[in-house]
Curated annotation (Swiss-Prot):
Listed name of the protein: NAD kinase
Domain of life of the source: Bacteria
Record GO biological process: NAD metabolic process; NADP biosynthetic process
Record's subcellular location: Cytoplasm
Disulphide linkage map: none
Binding site for NAD(+): 46-47, 51, 116-117, 146, 154, 157-162, 218
Pfam families to which the protein is assigned, alphabetical: NAD_kinase, NAD_kinase_C
Leader peptide range in chain numbering: none
Amino acid sequence: MARKFNSLAFIASPAEEAQKAAEDLRAVYGDHDPDKADVIVALGGDGFMLHTLHRTMNTGKLVYGMNRGSVGFLMNRYSTENLHQRIANADENAFHPLEMRTTDVNGDKFTALAINEVYLFRQSYQAAKLKVMVDGKTRLDELTCDGLLLATPAGSTAYNLSAHGPILPLEAPLLALTPVSPFRPRRWRGALLPNHVTVDIEILEADKRPVNAVADHQEVKSVVHVRIAESEKLTARILSDPDHSWSDRILAEQFSN
């Protein structure tokens, strides 16, 4: 049975095309305060959708995106017609973000959330050296690489795919641990981990080989330790058209040229 939503809130990226779309949709459907609306309609590209999901994770709000950007992997097709019906018939995907806890060279601590991935990368011309632990057990004593990332199924088609990591079905209870340009160990190309594990990464020779850490768009410089785990307290909820579902998009990506 289709759900019924009475109120929509339209938010748009600063791009002219997105702003114009918001004006057109408000003229047809009205507009509500995002805090009080049943559904938030995000207009823009994938970056804006990520930003919107970060804003709504602690509220449980449903987000329906329409592409007014470039790639639009996370977005639905843009149209001003039958929007209430499209949203009522949409499939819902709900997932927990990753929580990144960092300690930097000064001992300062910082926490950030990631829907796509948490990644570490070398800050200088020298390769990073990392010690990798999973649930307290050391799995790699020393990984020499340009970087390392932990991706969710939702983020597995983004940076993770560019780094030759595996694409994960959206419903898979897995995380992809993927190295970026690994040098040693020679044959290690990553691992699939259960989504309930805690991953600790210790930066070796941090003063000589500085490393930054990023959770989606939030960057912390010169870290010495990073802990990553799924945050079960927060949930991102996204709606997709049945004929262009998120799961189908991820499947199609595995057969693209």
